[in-house]
Every structure is written in C-alpha cells, then in structure tokens.
C-alpha cells in the first residue's frame, strides 16, 4: 500500500517532466535548416532547334558555407552549353544562379543536379562543410518539342 502511495505521489512530477521534455523535443525538431533549396526553371515547350535557357537558383539555410558542383543530365544526349559544370561556394547570405543555353529537336527529360563536394580553393579560407545525411540533390523537368 505504501509503495502504491509513492507511485501516485511521483506521478504528477513525472508527468510534468515528460511534458516539458516532449515540448522541448518538438521545438528542436521544428528548427531544422534546409541544406539545399533549388528552383529549376526551363520552358515547358519549344520549337525544334530553338535555343533553350535553363536556370537553376540554389540557396541554403545553413550558417556554414558549402562547395557545390551543379550540372544537368538529360534522357538524350544534348550539345552545347548543356554539358557545362559549375563549381561555386554557396553560403546563406550568397545564393547562386546558374545558366545553361542549349538546343534540342526532341522532347527530353532534364535533371538539374547539385552535389556538395570537398574541393579546396573555392570557399574563402577553405572554410566549408559537407552534410552527413546526403550530398546530392536534384530536380527533374520535361522539355517538350512541338
């Protein structure tokens, strides 16, 4: 009987502690920063052999800078500036925008890829981080030729 009374006496304090811990854990989970935020823009449709400009805007919510390499991949081989790869230092206060100009005469799926890489001489003082969870981010669009 005495043990049961102790159990009920500790219960409100335990419940309050659990509630505080739960509220603290939820607040910490909501405060996660996005590693890469990307906006890939290409026209939805073009005429055959018309010049296409693809634009990829990249930013981060991390406080630290990262070295990123951006490039495009397509479902069919494309010529020209499509094959350019860009390497840049991406920081919270310095978003980047990349451009590719190319031609196509058939419908194609295009993926814009952002790799977080380890490379010296890109960020000031070589101060950059690499995320542990993932280091490749991509988005795809379809370009129709009509």
UniProtKB/Swiss-Prot annotation:
Entry keyword Glycoprotein: yes
Keyword Ion transport recorded: no
Domain of life according to the entry: Eukaryota
Signal peptide: 1-28
Compartment list: Secreted
GO molecular function per UniProt: aspartic-type endopeptidase activity
Residues carrying sugar: 105
Disulfide bonds: 65-91, 89-123
GO cellular component: extracellular space
Modified residues (Pyrrolidone carboxylic acid): 29
GO terms, biological process: proteolysis; regulation of immune system process
Pfam families documented for this protein: SVA (PF05326)
Keywords on record: Disulfide bond, Glycoprotein, Pyrrolidone carboxylic acid, Secreted, Signal
Family the entry assigns: Belongs to the PIP family.
Quaternary context: Monomer. Interacts with AZGP1.
The name this protein goes by in its record: Prolactin-inducible protein homolog
Gene name as annotated: PIP
């Amino acid at each position: 009987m005495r043990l049961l009374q102790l159990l009920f006496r500790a219960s409100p304090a335990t419940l309050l502690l659990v509630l505080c811990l739960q509220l603290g854990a939820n607040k910490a989970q909501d405060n996660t920063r996005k590693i890469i935020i990307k906006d890939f823009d290409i026209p939805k449709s073009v005429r055959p052999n018309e010049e296409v400009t693809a634009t990829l805007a990249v930013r981060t919510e991390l406080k630290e800078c990262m070295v990123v390499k951006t490039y495009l991949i397509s479902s069919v081989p494309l010529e020209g500036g499509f094959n350019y790869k860009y390497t840049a230092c991406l920081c919270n206060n310095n978003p980047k925008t990349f451009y590719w100009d190319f031609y196509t005469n058939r419908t194609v799926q295009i993926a814009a890829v952002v790799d977080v890489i380890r490379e010296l001489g890109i960020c000031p003082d070589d101060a950059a981080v690499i995320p542990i969870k993932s280091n490749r981010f991509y988005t795809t669009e379809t370009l129709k030729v009509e």
